[in-house]
Amino acid sequence: MVGPGPTAAAAVEERQRKLQEYLAAKGKLKSQNTKPYLKSKNNCQNQPPSKSTIRPKNDVTNHVVLPVKPKRSISIKLQPRPPNTAGSQKPKLEPPKLLGKRLTSECVSSNPYSKPSSKSFQQCEAGSSTTGELSRKPVGSLNIEQLKTTKQQLTDQGNGKCIDFMNNIHVENESLDNFLKETNKENLLDILTEPERKPDPKLYTRSKPKTDSYNQTKNSLVPKQALGKSSVNSAVLKDRVNKQFVGETQSRTFPVKSQQLSRGADLARPGVKPSRTVPSHFIRTLSKVQSSKKPVVKNIKDIKVNRSQYERPNETKIRSYPVTEQRVKHTKPRTYPSLLQGEYNNRHPNIKQDQKSSQVCIPQTSCVLQKSKAISQRPNLTVGRFNSAIPSTPSIRPNGTSGNKHNNNGFQQKAQTLDSKLKKAVPQNHFLNKTAPKTQADVTTVNGTQTNPNIKKKATAEDRRKQLEEWQKSKGKTYKRPPMELKTKRKVIKEMNISFWKSIEKEEEEKKAQLELSSKINNTLTECLNLIEGGVPSNEILNILSSIPEAEKFAKFWICKAKLLASKGTFDVIGLYEEAIKNGATPIQELRKVVLNILQDSNRTTEGITSDSLVAETSITSVEELAKKMESVKSCLSPKEREQVTATPRIAKAEQHNYPGIKLQIGPIPRINGMPEVQDMKFITPVRRSSRIERAVSRYPEMLQEHDLVVASLDELLEVEETKCFIFRRNEALPVTLGFQTPES
């Protein structure tokens, strides 16, 4: 490792030399865990020996006492990446934002075990030159100095991401080892004593992205093992460790700025979920509880917060941060269970320090420890360091999206390999990591207490309802209901029903009254008939009959009158019958029977009759003659009376055959081939017709009227129809022959 070079040329030379050493060490070393939270465990536990970065990491691992999974980091593809990282680091000589990321990546790359460590180491070399260039650029005196020192430290320490550059300390591999051991011890002591101290925001912020207190406890319990594992998985975990550690250091060093900057970084990084920033002491507490749960996610968020915090003073760093955040996002799903366990163990403050230092130590051990020291000494400079450390991890995952350009190529390859491995190994952890930072950020409060956001929302909804009700009551406001129209509608409906039923009742009452009246009249007329037969004087009976209202509509009235007249002597029976029909007497058939009996009475001729003409007429008159006379009177009668009069003789004739209401229908014979003589003949078919329909048929349309000719008797048939030959056709529904002989079929 080369001593810190303030100028860009010196930084470039140191970076190149570091790159060569790192590549040589990388050939021996295997990729460390890209998951920073796993790095803290695995790297600290078992760090595969490396030329420069591995030694301080091993020392840090010894200090942290986390020997667990050194093999994962080895399995990760870090060796092929050193050249890629070197190439990526060279183009990544960019403004302070790249520098911040490079610092992080350099610190991470300092640990050859992890891919991010190699990349970060290369980035540190490139970062040194870029730091010099950035120091030249007006990014801020503090930021330029921090970047320069970070470049030097990264070049010297490899694993010292930005802590040494904050102090402008160049530490070689041995110095990194010693410094990492010391810093790990110091950080462990600081974390054990004061896990919420601001100088340790790196660790706390790292644990914070881990998100869950129980995970933090696990981290505290397994930090040494996680460090050992992280040394094995240094390549895989280095990025995450760097991200987490850098995020922790940044958040701890600048609690307020980290929150504000995290907002800016989150806004600048649409892919990255914005984490809620809280003061450093709150971040520490949250990092303790939450880092163990979901270290990767919180590391991302912390990195975002730290980037945003430090990117505001150093806008160039902010640019580099979005890349690191993206990378961190990619690395989150790649978190290893060992790293998660290590971060779970971080719940204990002492173990948190070990774990954080170890996580950073595997790829970034010395750098992170130095960063923690530098942060405790110089919080402003630690901001730059943290910014630089943060981009290293994200640069590994985004694969040169927007972080350290120098490390983009190598980190992209590493990130790809790590992404595939981590996705396979820890898909659930990635999901938890993604979700964890949100929950942690939501759980974090100003008082540093953790609460469940879901419970808060439920409580707030209920409280809001209650408050709304109370407020409405206090203001005297009530919801106005529309006027109840149903009652009025119901009333209207009831009235309508009442009127309807009343009308029906009235009709029924009227009918009942009519029936009662008709029954009374019938009873009275029946008594009169009995009196006439009993020999009561006719004058008294006539007085009674004249006193009965509407008696003319009853046939019994006319029967009584006919009997009274017959008892006195001869009278015009047919005239009486015609008058009864005009008045609409019913039932007319009873009157007809009486009239026929009077006419047929032979005793009547023996009695004294003054007029010979009347005697001859009565003796010769028959029912058919009466019918003809009634037809002559039809012109004087109303339609109803006319129908009744016309029906009288027909019914009388039908009565001869005992088939009342039957008429004759004349219809044409269908044409038959070979029988032309049949065409002159017509069918006569007996049919039954309703008198009610006959009365109303005149009002029917033509389609409903009778199409064929219908006659009441044969005499009428001869008058109407000119056809001389008729064929009687039997009606199956009416088995009546009417005296015709049915042809045998």
Curated annotation (Swiss-Prot):
Q: Where is this motif: KEN box?
A: 185-187
The biased composition feature labelled Low complexity covers 109-120
Question: InterPro entries of this UniProt entry?
Answer: CKAP2-like (IPR052855), CKAP2_C (IPR029197)
Q: Which residues carry this modification: Phosphothreonine?
A: T742
Q: What does the UniProt entry say about where the protein is found?
A: Cytoplasm, Cytoskeleton, Spindle pole
User: Cross-link Glycyl lysine isopeptide (Lys-Gly) (interchain with G-Cter in SUMO2): which residues?
Assistant: K198
**Phosphoserine occurs at which residues?**
S745
- Note on domains (UniProt): The KEN box is required for the association with the APC/C-Cdh1 complex, ubiquitination and degradation.
**Disease linkage:** Filippi syndrome: A rare disorder characterized by microcephaly, pre- and postnatal growth failure, syndactyly, and distinctive facial features, including a broad nasal bridge and underdeveloped alae nasi. Some affected individuals have intellectual disability, seizures, undescended testicles in males, and teeth and hair abnormalities.
Query: What protein name is recorded for this chain?
Result: Cytoskeleton-associated protein 2-like
